Each structure stands twice: as structure tokens, then as C-alpha cells.
Amino acid sequence: MNIKEVDVLIIGAGPAGSLAAREASKNGAKTLIIDKKSEIGTPKRCAEGIMSGVLERVHITPDERWIARKIDGARIVSPNNTSAWFTPETLETPATGIILERKVFDKHMTMDAIREGAEVMIKTEALSMKREGDGYLVDIKSFNKEYNQIKAHIVIGADGPEGHVARWAELNTKVPLAEMESGLQYEMTNLKMKNNSVIQFFFGSVAPGGYAWIFPKGYDTANVGIDISGIKAEKSAVKYLNDFIANCDETKDGQIVEINAGGNPLCGIFDKIITDNVMLVGDAAGCVSPITGGGIDTALESGMIAGRVAAKAIKNRDYSEEKLQEYADYIDSHLGKKFKKYIAIRDVLYNSSDEDLDEYITALANANITKLSTKSLIKVVMKISPRKLFKLRKILL
């Protein structure tokens, strides 16, 4: 058996895994990332949107090579096609964001980790993991066949919502069916968007228990997708998305150039995301917005903190759950509490009738909202439906 020994092994080279590797390496840990894919960043599994401020927070310098489109606003559309627009003309502080080219972005994040000293092995799959001594021994199947096992003091699971690290470490990350969304997205071109500098959200029976979206990537190109509830939907995601595209003036003449599909866990942060020698990050930890299913920003943040905590544990030669608790505490205070509020909003939003949604979004369209935030939107809606939204008052306001 050829065994490779490292301080920190990261399984999965997405945004969370690469940020964890960057920080662990920068802080002195011998770090290895493995990824089962032959090309990092493929296939993409999200709408690729991120708020501009996130990059600064996780110390990433914007690079035009992975920026597909810059965004300066949003549009929320009701079932009866009423639109609430939030643009630089209406907002005191524009809601700026970026639509990434994930295939390029993810690869660049891994390259940044390499520049900090991390090692990367692609087309390398983790097959099993067992405790050995003061760490874990991971069996792998690798393209280069140089090694078939890796010994690590700390293993970071960045292997997504269907990952194996959590199960191998006996961490419960099972998602209830009611909180798992089915997602389908087409990258399309030849679209006729009303404004190709805003992201658009469509709510109601067009996407039961979820929403449809148009995220522009160019003048006439966008990610067009849908998230639906596994227990509310009466048709397949393909049928809902195709119907949406056929009935939307902006998309009906478009052509598909790429198809992406996957599941989104909307349950919030899992109860336990660490144990002795193991941490979970990104989607594997439940770091996914319970409202939108978006997770790039939280993946980056969770990976960054996990990498720092891992390096500190390596320096202290203490890989216990108690030592790794610093990471779990950070996630709970910065994401967990916020996500619990988001779950309350989601439950109201996704259980509202089309008529209720028409009423809510019409109120937003007629309101003079100058600062776009969850709280400002809820305040407007509560004025017209205080009884229906009463349970949100204590949580949010």
C-alpha cells in the first residue's frame, strides 16, 4: 500500500474546499485537496450569483476572467405578472452582485490554494475512511495510481449534499424530503430580457414550494432555472421549467446550450458539523440559504474559517472535537441563527397561495423601498397582511 501523509485532507475542490485549503496552507498545515472530477468546476450546479461584498469578506480579488456579468438590481415577479423592481434608480445603495463563470471561478480558487502551498489531486475519489491512530486513513482510487491511501490528522468534508464524509464520520446530515428542493437549470441564449443587469425571481404555482429564476450572463444569455418542492410538485422539474420558458416572453425564443440538475437542501445548518478530526463545510454542512438555495457565499465563508481552525489545531497537535468547536461556534453565530429566520420566511412564502403572493408583491411594487433587505421587504408586506405574517413579527422585527 502506498500511503500519502498530510496534516489536512480536503475532499472536494468546490469553493468551500478550495478556501479551506487556501487558509490551512497559508497558516502552515500540509494540505491536500482531492476531487473525483477530471476538471474542477464542472459540471456547475447553481445559478452562479453572488453579492459583490462577499468576495471582499473572504479576501478574493475580483478577476474579469471569471465574471460573466455584473448585476445592479433585482426583479420579483408575482403569479399575475406584477413586478417589483429594485434598481439603481430606486435604491439609495444599489444591490450589486456578480454572475460567475463557475467553471473558471472554481478552478481559480483551487489555483489560489496551490499558490499558498496546497497540493491537489484531481480524478481522485475517496472510497472509504476509517480511524487510525490520531487521524483517519482514507482509501482512494486515483488517476495517477501513485497512492491508494491518504493518512490525515484532519479531514474536511467539502463533498456536497450527497457527500460521504459525513456518513463515514457518523455525522447525521440526512435531509427531510420536505426540505429538499429539486433543481433544474438551462443556460440559454437568444433571450429577450427586459433588463439584463438584474436577477429575476418568479414565485407561485409556476414553481410549487420554490421559485423560477433568470440570472443574466450576457446581453442575451442567462441561467434560467427552477427549484420545486419534492412534496408540493405535481409534475417533474423538467415539465415545470419547460412550461415556464414557453410562457415567459423573455425566454420563449431562447435556445438551450447547457443543462444542469441537482438537489438543494433547505434545512439550514446541520445540528452537528464536527467531530474528532473531521469538519464539514459548504453544502455538506448545510450552508445553503433556506430561502433561495444559494450557497456560494456561505461555502466560501465556511471553508475559510474551517481552514484556519484546522491549521490552528495542527499547530497545537490537538484534533479533538473540542478543539474544532471554534469552527462550529462561528458557523452557528454567523449563519445558523440567520438561517433559522430564513426558514420561517420560507415556510410563509412557499406556503402562500398565488392570490396571497400577488398581494404581497403588488405591495412591494407600490412601496418606496430605498434599501433592499429582508427586513425592509417583510415590513412592507406585513402592513397589508398582518394576520398572515404575524408569526414573523417576533422573529424578524
Swiss-Prot record:
Cofactor(s) listed: FAD
Binding residue positions for FAD: A16, D35, C46, A47, G49, R102, A126, D283, G295, I296
Enzyme Commission number(s) from the entry: 1.3.-.-
Residues reported in the UniProt entry to bind a 2,3-bis-O-(geranylgeranyl)-sn-glycerol 1-phospholipid: K338
Top-level division of the source organism's lineage: Archaea
Single GO MF descriptor: oxidoreductase activity, acting on the CH-CH group of donors, NAD or NADP as acceptor
GO cellular component, one term: membrane
GO process terms (BP): glycerophospholipid biosynthetic process; membrane lipid biosynthetic process
Catalytic reaction(s) noted: a 2,3-bis-O-phytanyl-sn-glycerol 1-phospholipid + 8 A = a 2,3-bis-O-(geranylgeranyl)-sn-glycerol 1-phospholipid + 8 AH2; 2,3-bis-O-(phytanyl)-sn-glycerol 1-phosphate + 8 A = 2,3-bis-O-(geranylgeranyl)-sn-glycerol 1-phosphate + 8 AH2; CDP-2,3-bis-O-(geranylgeranyl)-sn-glycerol + 8 AH2 = CDP-2,3-bis-O-(phytanyl)-sn-glycerol + 8 A; archaetidylserine + 8 AH2 = 2,3-bis-O-phytanyl-sn-glycero-3-phospho-L-serine + 8 A
Pfam families linked: FAD_binding_3, GGR_cat
Textual note on the cofactor: Binds 1 FAD per subunit.
Keywords in alphabetical order: FAD, Flavoprotein, Lipid biosynthesis, Lipid metabolism, Oxidoreductase, Phospholipid biosynthesis, Phospholipid metabolism
Pathway: Membrane lipid metabolism; glycerophospholipid metabolism
Function: Is involved in the reduction of 2,3-digeranylgeranylglycerophospholipids (unsaturated archaeols) into 2,3-diphytanylglycerophospholipids (saturated archaeols) in the biosynthesis of archaeal membrane lipids. Catalyzes the formation of archaetidic acid (2,3-di-O-phytanyl-sn-glyceryl phosphate) from 2,3-di-O-geranylgeranylglyceryl phosphate (DGGGP) via the hydrogenation of each double bond of the isoprenoid chains.
Family label: Belongs to the geranylgeranyl reductase family. DGGGPL reductase subfamily.
Note, other: Reduction reaction proceeds via syn addition of hydrogen for double bonds.
Protein name (database record): Digeranylgeranylglycerophospholipid reductase 3
Species of origin: Methanosphaera stadtmanae (strain ATCC 43021 / DSM 3091 / JCM 11832 / MCB-3)
